[in-house]
């Protein structure tokens, strides 16, 4: 069986005197263990990135979560609080990458910040602080808990009937983790809701009329993916799409 090459988004971070293009180990492990893929990192080169070369190389793209948030001018939002972390290099690399990848049929799976990037890339907007929005619950993790506690199931999501996610399980409602404080406000153009939280917050989206797998989720299915059947089913579906895309390139 073909081992698909999966491009993983990175964050542009400065440590000491130098900048690094880096990605979380849990995403790399999920690509290897949950879908049998070969991970490579996509550097945040903005307009210097050769998208055509990237798309001819990879069989799928995984957009990761991050400690940074999309800079709000990309969705006509108000200025962020001074304590908010942004990553302008990632914004400039990934926001244009998403529609380009979808248009050429590259399978795309977006998680957390990646999910929010997907919405913004299609002219959607974000809540900068979900917990301050009337009627919305607090979706942030409990930082007093250990890592297992922070990533434990936090709330349910209701799946859209006949949607991408609903086809992966017999359940209409499942429990997911929640470690975010930004979230989708206005849904982007050409996007479809795949799951919502009890407070109505959009938790998963897909791209209508995409040529291939194009899904984004707010939660973190890469966390303990081999232990949670629903999370594994999502990576399995992404993996099948990537393997099929790789086979077509032979």
Residue ranges and their predicted role:
Residues 178:
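Short basic/aromatic active-site micro-motif
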Residues 115:
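The feature captures the ABC ATPase H-loop/switch
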Residues 1-109, 120, 127, 131-168, ...:
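N-terminal beta1-alpha1 cap of cysteine-dependent amidohydrolase-like domains
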Residues 215-218:
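Active-site-proximal beta-strand elements of phosphoester/diester hydrolases
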Residues 112:
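Conserved G/P- and acidic residue-centered "switch" motifs that form tight phosphate/ATP-binding loops
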Residues 170-175:
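Catalytic cores of DNA base-excision repair glycosylases
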């Amino acid at each position: 069986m073909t081992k698909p090459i999966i491009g993983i988004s990175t964050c542009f971070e400065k440590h000491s005197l130098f900048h690094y293009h880096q990605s979380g180990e849990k995403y790399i492990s999920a690509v290897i263990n949950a879908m049998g893929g070969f991970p490579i990192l996509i550097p945040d080169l903005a307009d210097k990135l050769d998208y055509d070369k990237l798309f001819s190389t990879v069989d799928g793209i995984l957009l990761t979560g991050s400690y940074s948030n999309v800079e709000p001018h990309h969705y006509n939002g108000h200025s962020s609080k001074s304590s908010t972390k942004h990553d302008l290099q990632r914004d400039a690399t990934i926001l244009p990458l998403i529609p380009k990848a979808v248009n050429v049929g590259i399978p795309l799976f977006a998680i957390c910040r990646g999910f929010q990037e997907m919405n913004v890339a299609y002219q959607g907007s974000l809540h900068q602080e979900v917990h301050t929005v009337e009627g919305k619950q607090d979706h942030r993790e409990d930082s007093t808990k250990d890592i297992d506690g922070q990533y434990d199931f936090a709330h349910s999501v209701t799946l859209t009937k006949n949607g991408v996610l609903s086809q992966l399980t017999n359940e209409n409602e499942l429990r997911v983790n929640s470690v975010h404080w930004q979230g989708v406000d206005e849904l982007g153009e050409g996007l479809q809701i795949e799951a919502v939280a009890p407070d109505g917050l959009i938790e998963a989206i897909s791209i209508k009329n995409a040529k291939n797998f194009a899904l984004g989720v707010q939660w973190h299915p890469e966390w303990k993916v081999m232990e949670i059947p629903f999370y594994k089913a999502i990576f399995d579906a992404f993996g099948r799409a990537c393997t099929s895309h790789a086979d077509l390139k032979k």
